């Protein structure tokens, strides 16, 4: 009885080991088939030798064993014999791997590493297209910069043309006798006008060098002209002085109004001294004007007689000449 039970347990252990090994192989084959479904182009039996290795590792189908009662088939004096498996069953038998080793060996990461060359071949075109797109975006930045620079140049050119047009308009207003308003005509007439002005300036400078002081009212002798109520007296050098040494004095009376014109050399302080000498003669100055004429001063004075004024034209001229001769 103990022999039968021992044999039954040994056969039971063999069956359990074979069932466990078949379960592991079925799970491995299932994972391989699942990976083949995910990557259909990567699994080919002709190109990848690792696929054949997986097929060879599949164990042969284990035949089912039936239990035969020893009392019915064995002779009474015979001993039970152990059932020997085929040698291939011992070659394809697997050792007891841990669950972690099995999961690591046939995990999706491990399978991906096996089929990585083909996967890289499939992924590389997409990566290249992505890199090309990224490069395209980088190349678009200089194009946008060039476009903005072109717009800035266009705006600057417009402003420059506006300023140029405004200056042409201002130049056309300065040129006399302008008939046409186009730019070429404006520039041509402006050049002609500038040349004319330059020639005119040269002529005036030559006249200034050759100019001599000429007195328009020079009398060799004193004379008195009486014309109704209007009296006039002009005085010039009659004592041998040159025309430039003594001033020219002209005095006119019209009732209470007095007109005095003096032409003298231009020196500092002459105008104030002349005004002071006129006021000493009891003449009230109401208006005066001074003009520069070369190296001389042309002084014109309008005045009125005061109540205590009692002088003749000759007395006024002589008094002014004697006073001016002291400081001129």
UniProtKB/Swiss-Prot annotation:
Induction remark: By ethylene (ACC) and jasmonic acid (JA) treatments.
InterPro entries listed in its UniProt record: bHLH_dom, bHLH_transcription_regulator, HLH_DNA-bd_sf
Region (Disordered): 125-152
Expression (tissue specificity): Expressed in flowers.
Chief location bin: nucleus
GO BP annotations listed: regulation of DNA-templated transcription
UniProt entry keywords in alphabetical sequence: DNA-binding, Nucleus, Transcription, Transcription regulation
Keyword DNA-binding: yes
Keyword DNA-binding: yes
Subcellular locations according to the entry: Nucleus
GO terms under cellular component: nucleus
Chain ranges of the bHLH domain: 148-197
Gene Ontology molecular functions: DNA-binding transcription factor activity; protein dimerization activity; transcription cis-regulatory region binding
Subunit structure and binding partners: Homodimer.
Protein's name in the database: Transcription factor bHLH25
Organism: Arabidopsis thaliana (Mouse-ear cress)
